[in-house]
A protein has these predicted regions:
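Short, glycine- and charge-enriched coil/turn segments that flank and shape catalytic ligand pockets
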Residues: 5-9, 37-40, 66-74, 109-117
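Cysteine-nucleophile active-site neighborhood
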Residues: 1-40
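Acyltransferase
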Residues: 79-139
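Fold-independent oxyanion-binding glycine-rich loops
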Residues: 1, 19-20, 46-49, 88-90
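Short, acidic Gly/Pro/Ser/Thr-rich loop/turn segments
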Residues: 21-24, 50-53, 91-95
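Catalytic beta-strand/loop cores that center a nucleophilic Ser/Cys/Thr
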Residues: 33-81
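Hydrophobic/aromatic beta-strand patches that form the interior of the parallel beta-sheet core
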Residues: 15, 44, 84-86
Length: 139
């Protein structure tokens, strides 16, 4: 819906996700682990906005480690159909092969008009790295 600056100026959003973000002086910085429909997702957050989801807006994930949207409600990001909004930075797609495969599938389906299943890929090294990150961050 909107972004409200630290000075109180309201800037309209695109209307895709039902979220309102308030700019803050304090930053939320650090590694994040989320529980999502795509499995655990790891990343890094560095933001000063505090985002609140609208009543019917689904979050991208639930915070297992980190601050998330606002440091208090346990949500991170927002998802509507094939749109994901998130504060996560870093190598999000290589670090989360299941999420990457899902996004590739969505894009291919939108491009071709039919469901597309990614071919068999050897994601073993990526899966091991992902599991190591999740385990380390939740320890």
């Amino acid at each position: 819906k909107a972004f409200v600056t630290v000075e109180g100026k309201t800037l309209p959003g695109l209307g895709i996700l039902d979220v309102t973000t308030q700019g803050n002086e304090k930053r939320m910085i650090g590694p994040v682990v989320l529980g999502t429909d795509f499995g655990d997702v790891v990343g890094y957050e560095n933001h000063s906005g505090s985002t609140t989801l609208g009543a019917g807006q689904a979050p991208f994930g639930r915070v297992r480690s980190g601050m998330g949207n606002n440091g208090s409600d346990g949500t991170e990001g927002a998802v509507t159909e094939h749109v994901i909004g998130s504060y996560l930075h870093g190598p999000i797609l290589p670090a989360n092969p299941r999420l990457a495969d899902t996004l590739i599938g969505w894009a291919a389906e939108l491009a071709t008009g039919r469901p597309v299943e990614p071919g068999d890929l050897d994601d073993e090294v990526a899966r091991q790295a992902h599991t190591h990150q999740v385990t380390r961050l939740l320890a």
